Amino acid sequence: MNLTFKNLQQQKFVISDVSADTKISELKEKIQTQQNYEVERQKLIYSGRILADDKTVGEYNIKEQDFIVCMVSRPKTSTSTPKSAASPAPNPPASVPEKKVEAPSSTVAESTSTTQTVAAAAPSNPDTTATSEAPIDANTLAVGAQRNVAVENMVEMGYERSEVERAMRAAFNNPDRAVEYLLTGIPEDILNRQREESAAALAAQQQQSEALAPTSTGQPANLFEQAALSENENQEQPSNTVGDDPLGFLRSIPQFQQLRQIVQQNPQMLETILQQIGQGDPALAQAITQNPEAFLQLLAEGAEGESALPSGGIQIQITQEESESIDRLCQLGFDRNIVIQAYLACDKNEELAANYLFEHGHESEDEP
């Protein structure tokens, strides 16, 4: 019989003359002959299981109308010519570049300049860097229809859609890495980080909810109402709710000072805070939506309310590279304003912003 195979790029190929007695190891050899995929790098997946080399096609009950996923792992990095000339032992240099490239992945949460780390390693071994860098390069993120195809492909392997989505989030939307997580499990350090982020988000949300709650003195929780009371008490002062500083009245409200401290201590809570404001103070939420830059500038100011930059004009500088990062995040299917807020809240770290958007981005879009 003829068996159909798919790789992770949705490319199909057919292996002929296969019988129920054909061993999986023999099947891999046929694939190597036809597709030049090394046997050692092949993983054949059917119904969510990795096929063992010593089993036969018949033991897995594979039928001709079915298809098998052929996953080819990345080759081990080889020693470059400059490295070989500098050292007589080939094996140690082969592992060194691999560690250099993986370093940005482990430190991505603390640094916003991962591209500089990769670029620094490139001159010493450009070929190796280009190969090993792919799994963590933001450009390898599957977006839009590409992501949908990747998810469907993994679902067709036999995995639950919820498991696939979880793996994609953990892999920052990288299909190759998500498949590895499905096969081997999500690394414990990533699970721990997600648990810590969830716990921190819950604690910050509780603190923020207390800040939004009415005070014991009977002051209204609605920030616009507080602003109106403040203006009535100080009618001699001109209102600053319009013009170049449409949200300037927030500086005089103690509860906003608390919200600002929460965001400065936990930037990942920005989206949750905006959702809370949308539920409890729709008028303020609309004003923030219409003036996102002014709102972000208020959040960036010092605790005493002084402006960090002169009023008027665009206060946040975005480089061409950062603009491209924002565009790529928008291609994931999120509103641009939400993307900008998440990107800035994550200290302009594209991978962290992507992960945060997949966790919380659609929640804000569902708000009325």
From Swiss-Prot:
Gene3D superfamilies: DNA helicase RuvA subunit, C-terminal domain, Phosphatidylinositol 3-kinase Catalytic Subunit, Chain A, domain 1, XPC-binding domain. The modification Phosphoserine is found at S84, S87, S364. Residues 76-88, 103-124 have a biased composition (Low complexity). Keywords: DNA damage, DNA repair, Nucleus, Phosphoprotein, Repeat, Ubl conjugation pathway. It is found in: Nucleus. One of its GO terms (molecular function) is damaged DNA binding. GO terms for biological process: ERAD pathway; nucleotide-excision repair; proteasome-mediated ubiquitin-dependent protein catabolic process. Its main location: nucleus. InterPro entries: Rad23, STI1_HS-bd, UBA, UBA-like_sf, Ubiquitin-like_dom, Ubiquitin-like_domsf, XPC-bd, XPC-bd_sf. One of its GO terms (cellular component) is nucleus. Residues 135-185, 320-360 form the UBA domain. Coiled coil: none annotated. Pfam families: UBA (PF00627), ubiquitin (PF00240), XPC-binding (PF09280). Involved in postreplication repair of UV-damaged DNA. Postreplication repair functions in gap-filling of a daughter strand on replication of damaged DNA. Protects ubiquitin chains against dissambly by deubiquitinating enzymes thereby promoting protein degradation. PANTHER family: UV EXCISION REPAIR PROTEIN RAD23. This is UV excision repair protein rhp23. It comes from Schizosaccharomyces pombe (strain 972 / ATCC 24843) (Fission yeast).
